[in-house]
Amino acid sequence: MASPRTRKVLKEVRAQDENNVCFECGAFNPQWVSVTYGIWICLECSGRHRGLGVHLSFVRSVTMDKWKDIELEKMKAGGNAKFREFLETQDDYEPSWSLQDKYSSRAAALFRDKVATLAEGKEWSLESSPAQNWTPPQPKTLQFTAHRASGQPQSAAASGDKAFEDWLNDDLGSYQGAQENRYVGFGNTVPPQKREDDFLNNAMSSLYSGWSSFTTGASKFASAAKEGATKFGSQASQKASELGHSLNENVLKPAQEKVKEGRIFDDVSSGVSQLASKVQGVGSKGWRDVTTFFSGKAEDSSDRPLEGHSYQNSSGDNSQNSNIDQSFWETFGSAEPPKAKSPSSDSWTCADASTGRRSSDSWDVWGSGSASNNKNSNSDGWESWEGASGEGRAKATKKAAPSTADEGWDNQNW
């Protein structure tokens, strides 16, 4: 990249000596120059000048290349108008020259020497110039075979053009080198030649690189593991110290104080007694549950449903219940309020389980006219029926009035 100073100098030079147009084709605003002659050329003509070789024309870009001070001095010493006027003053100059002939001529060699001498700050004269003895390079001639397939020889012009092309190709090869060395001198370095052992070297370098990466990763892993172990150890020790402190404060110190005060045995005995009472309660409850399950009875008598009224009731346990209501028929037509009585059966005959006595119902006193109060009588209904007119009636007169406890059909108020 051209520096600001370089661009300033080139801008001043462009405004002089017809440098605002291409020296070869006359195109406006040229961006390339031939430093050897100090002339300005366009992009297309710069490619043609590169083909001549650096010994005939050294091409530089106005904006993209770096410039040296000697190159800027050559641009000041040369110029489009100066080079054209110098060529026209030479005896061997011909306007019909080709590009190669023009820059290979003695006149172009003299102007090159003049520009280089003036750029160095020296005086130049035509007589003392070493370019006076300049001989243009001879093109390489083709070696023709003695026997040609065709009888007609090639023309001199065709052979001359072929020789020029061969010479140009050789010159380009010497300047640019091989394909990979084309841009040498433009900031590119020449790559080293490949050898047969490059494959082995590349493999070994890859192996070394992989091993170095592995060692680096292993060292990082080891350092991370060390840090983790250190951190875990510190946390574990901290937790252990906290646990020991808590155990000392909550267990050991209270136990020591109780031992000193003599309360440790009281606490132990109270705890054992509480445990024994809980075990006893749980055991008794479990035994009641087991016995209740196998006996099929309820745990509490209050949980059993009340027995209802029926025509027959022979249960001995019901004789102790004195709060059972009398039925409707037992109090029907009675002027006296109902009284408590011992349980009796509504069946034909019922043995009193509590007293061992038997109470008679309506069949026992059928036809007797009055109820019998002999509770120890073992006669049934048919026996009373037979003695109704005889002994039964006489016995009935001797007995006291029937008790008001006889209800139902035995009541005389019915």
UniProtKB/Swiss-Prot annotation:
This is ADP-ribosylation factor GTPase-activating protein 1. It comes from Mus musculus (Mouse). Interacts with ARF1. Interacts with the COPI coat proteins, KDELR1 and TMED2. It is probably a component of the COPI coat protein complex. The interaction with TMED2 inhibits the GAP activity. It is found in: Cytoplasm; Golgi apparatus. GO terms for molecular function: GTPase activator activity; zinc ion binding. Residues 7-124 form the Arf-GAP domain. GO terms for cellular component: Golgi apparatus; postsynaptic density; synapse. InterPro entries: ARFGAP/RecO (IPR037278), ArfGAP_dom (IPR001164), ArfGAP_dom_sf (IPR038508). The keyword Flavoprotein does not apply. The region downstream of Arf-GAP domain is essential to GAP activity in vivo. This region may be required for its targeting to Golgi membranes. A zinc finger (C4-type) spans 22-45. The lineage of its organism: Eukaryota, Metazoa, Chordata, Craniata, Vertebrata. Residues 310-327, 334-347, 362-388 have a biased composition (Low complexity). Residues 296-414 are annotated as: Disordered. The gene is Arfgap1. Residues 297-307 have a biased composition (Basic and acidic residues). The modification Phosphothreonine is found at T135, T189, T349. SMART domains: ArfGap. The modification Phosphoserine is found at S150, S246, S342, S345, S347, S360, S362, S379. GTPase-activating protein (GAP) for the ADP ribosylation factor 1 (ARF1). Involved in membrane trafficking and /or vesicle transport. Promotes hydrolysis of the ARF1-bound GTP and thus, is required for the dissociation of coat proteins from Golgi-derived membranes and vesicles, a prerequisite for vesicle's fusion with target compartment. Probably regulates ARF1-mediated transport via its interaction with the KDELR proteins and TMED2. Overexpression induces the redistribution of the entire Golgi complex to the endoplasmic reticulum, as when ARF1 is deactivated. It comes from the Eukaryota. The modification N6-acetyllysine is found at K231. GO terms for biological process: protein transport; regulation of endocytosis; vesicle-mediated transport.
